[in-house]
């Protein structure tokens, strides 16, 4: 059995086994100069693909999970058999996080939040600049590897971070925007300058996509 996923782009059959790949919605150089082509290529084809491969391997033989989306799996880890729970947490989380990440980036991104999300950010944080400062702090101070997030938690916006590939979905929180702060996401271009990478993120955030996520979550 291979993972069923609602964003399947295409399937490649090798020796009767299906490998599920994900949509990558733009060219690898589309986010330059902020996110460079080589990093995005490796990030997508190597790192993200490894999470999918490992997740499919973990789910092999678990027909009871065949109809679960990756989001359902990471949101309900206690329902996943204990023998594969850690693998699903790490690799399912990595798959869900990266899938989300690609969809909130855009070559036409940047600027200001829009719609009700803009109003909610202003109300919660006082200003867009104050929000960016809090989000940047969450990303910069995440020790080791992890993610910075703007989430909806019990109907309210919240800035948070998660370690490794943990998903906010596991905590019952719904992501609105997220930033991968693993070194593989930025080291080729920014080396150890994580704050510079975080600053570049604001040039490629798709606020229309974030507004849609917010509307679905609140």
Swiss-Prot record:
<dbReference type="Pfam" id="PF02777">
    <property type="entry name" value="Sod_Fe_C"/>
</dbReference>
<keyword id="KW-0479">Metal-binding</keyword>
<comment type="subunit">
    <text>Homodimer.</text>
</comment>
<keyword id="KW-0464">Manganese</keyword>
<keyword id="KW-0560">Oxidoreductase</keyword>
<comment type="similarity">
    <text>Belongs to the iron/manganese superoxide dismutase family.</text>
</comment>
<dbReference type="GO" id="GO:0046872">
    <property type="term" value="F:metal ion binding"/>
</dbReference>
<comment type="function">
    <text>Destroys superoxide anion radicals which are normally produced within the cells and which are toxic to biological systems.</text>
</comment>
<dbReference type="GO" id="GO:0004784">
    <property type="term" value="F:superoxide dismutase activity"/>
</dbReference>
<dbReference type="InterPro" id="IPR019831">
    <property type="entry name" value="Mn/Fe_SOD_N"/>
</dbReference>
<dbReference type="GO" id="GO:0019430">
    <property type="term" value="P:removal of superoxide radicals"/>
</dbReference>
<protein>
    <recommendedName>
        <fullName>Superoxide dismutase [Mn] 1</fullName>
        <ecNumber>1.15.1.1</ecNumber>
    </recommendedName>
</protein>
<dbReference type="InterPro" id="IPR036324">
    <property type="entry name" value="Mn/Fe_SOD_N_sf"/>
</dbReference>
<feature type="binding site">
    <location>
        <position position="184"/>
    </location>
    <ligand>
        <name>Mn(2+)</name>
    </ligand>
</feature>
<dbReference type="InterPro" id="IPR001189">
    <property type="entry name" value="Mn/Fe_SOD"/>
</dbReference>
<dbReference type="InterPro" id="IPR019833">
    <property type="entry name" value="Mn/Fe_SOD_BS"/>
</dbReference>
<feature type="binding site">
    <location>
        <position position="180"/>
    </location>
    <ligand>
        <name>Mn(2+)</name>
    </ligand>
</feature>
<dbReference type="GO" id="GO:0005737">
    <property type="term" value="C:cytoplasm"/>
</dbReference>
<dbReference type="Pfam" id="PF00081">
    <property type="entry name" value="Sod_Fe_N"/>
</dbReference>
<feature type="binding site">
    <location>
        <position position="98"/>
    </location>
    <ligand>
        <name>Mn(2+)</name>
    </ligand>
</feature>
<dbReference type="InterPro" id="IPR036314">
    <property type="entry name" value="SOD_C_sf"/>
</dbReference>
<feature type="binding site">
    <location>
        <position position="43"/>
    </location>
    <ligand>
        <name>Mn(2+)</name>
    </ligand>
</feature>
<dbReference type="InterPro" id="IPR019832">
    <property type="entry name" value="Mn/Fe_SOD_C"/>
</dbReference>
């Amino acid at each position: 059995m291979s993972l069923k996923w609602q964003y399947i782009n295409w399937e490649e059959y090798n020796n009767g086994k299906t490998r599920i790949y994900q949509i990558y919605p733009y060219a690898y150089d589309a986010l330059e100069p902020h996110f460079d082509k080589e990093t995005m290529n490796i990030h997508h084809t190597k790192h993200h693909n490894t999470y999918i491969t490992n997740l499919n391997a973990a789910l092999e033989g678990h027909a009871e999970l065949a109809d679960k989306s990756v989001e359902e799996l990471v949101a309900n880890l206690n329902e996943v058999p204990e023998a594969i729970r850690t693998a699903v947490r790490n690799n399912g989380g990595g798959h869900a996080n990266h899938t989300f990440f690609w969809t909130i980036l855009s070559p036409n991104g940047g600027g200001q939040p829009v719609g009700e999300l803009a109003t909610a950010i202003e109300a919660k944080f006082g200003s867009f600049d104050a929000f960016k400062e809090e989000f940047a702090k969450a990303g910069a101070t995440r020790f080791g590897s992890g993610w910075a997030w703007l989430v909806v938690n019990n109907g309210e916006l919240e800035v948070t971070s998660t370690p490794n590939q943990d998903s906010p979905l596991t905590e019952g929180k719904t992501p609105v925007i997220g930033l991968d702060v693993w070194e593989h996401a930025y080291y080729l271009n920014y080396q150890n300058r994580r704050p510079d990478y975080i600053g570049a993120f604001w040039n490629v955030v798709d606020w229309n996509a974030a507004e849609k996520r917010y509307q679905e979550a609140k």
